[in-house]
């Protein structure tokens, strides 16, 4: 590097790019028979920065998966629920397309489309939201609506949701503003009755009111690094209009509200259309006919429903669907336990009748896919406890009798003569 000095021959040095002498610039950087001044270095940096800004949006746009690609990715992890996947794929694609192209297109302001998922426990609502966030590589956080209260009351403030999202991305505001928030048990904050009450409902309608602005879009002031709020503190400003909110709930009893509306429309008394019990719609079919007026009768306020324009309904999982969930997805439960046993150098086999028994047990418990893990865990608990202390075990076999609790898993040892059933 040369700094305002002549070379060994006493010759004056010049920048090879702009032609300025060493006396006209602060620094000259020497290369093989060439020199560049600090001003030209700054200019090069500016040019590169501008090019990066121009190229970045195009890269982002090309990186956004299409609705078909989103649906295909969901298929790898979530069994069934095809209508819900389609609705989610379109809604998520449109949301991130709006972010990547600005909030306006040709002067038309693009509205925000948050999502409401309605379906029974264990039908895949949370898994769908998590899978979407993983595909899009955006921060994701979950909140339980039952713990939320209005500001000033004992409980969790709604702005804590944004704080959790910031924690997921090390308080990077730009990343957080592209994240996904899933609010579970949203049906539990329904109004206690159809008519507005003069008494304060801090965990029901009050929470809906508090969530309105957050979901629609506001600038939330969040204390940095999870500190408590106080007047002298500088807050992080997070624009929630760019955050995708997905609300989910079981909405137990909503099918009866819909059924009443549908059946009332078909007439009553002598002019009514009489339907046999077998002809009446099941819960899944009824939920797919949900209208805003049904949600209002259930206890959600009209303003809150208006902030969740995209509604997707999920059906209760059938026995066949539960069997598929056990073995087909990329992170299927049986594959997870097989990987766990492989770490001990042991193979794990689930017989087909065992999978059927697990699914039947989950159907009886009415826990959906969520209950599958606890059933498998209970069946394998003793084996997982003993296995690390045992030698020469090559394989563990799970059949129907193991799931029903009649026998323990079959342990197959390396030496044929040592083959025996555990616990015999």
Swiss-Prot record:
What is the originating organism of this protein?
Enterobacter sp. (strain 638)
- One Pfam short name: zf-C4_ClpX
Which residues participate in ATP binding?
120-127
Subunit note: Component of the ClpX-ClpP complex. Forms a hexameric ring that, in the presence of ATP, binds to fourteen ClpP subunits assembled into a disk-like structure with a central cavity, resembling the structure of eukaryotic proteasomes.
The family database entries (NCBIfam families) matched by this protein are listed as: clpX, PRK05342.1
Q: Any signal peptide, and if so, which residues?
A: none
A GO CC annotation given for this chain: HslUV protease complex
Where is each ClpX-type ZB domain found?
2-56
Function description:
ATP-dependent specificity component of the Clp protease. It directs the protease to specific substrates. Can perform chaperone functions in the absence of ClpP.
Please report the name of this protein according to its UniProt entry. Answer: ATP-dependent Clp protease ATP-binding subunit ClpX
The entry sums up its family as follows: Belongs to the ClpX chaperone family.
Which residues are recorded as binding Zn(2+)? 15, 18, 37, 40
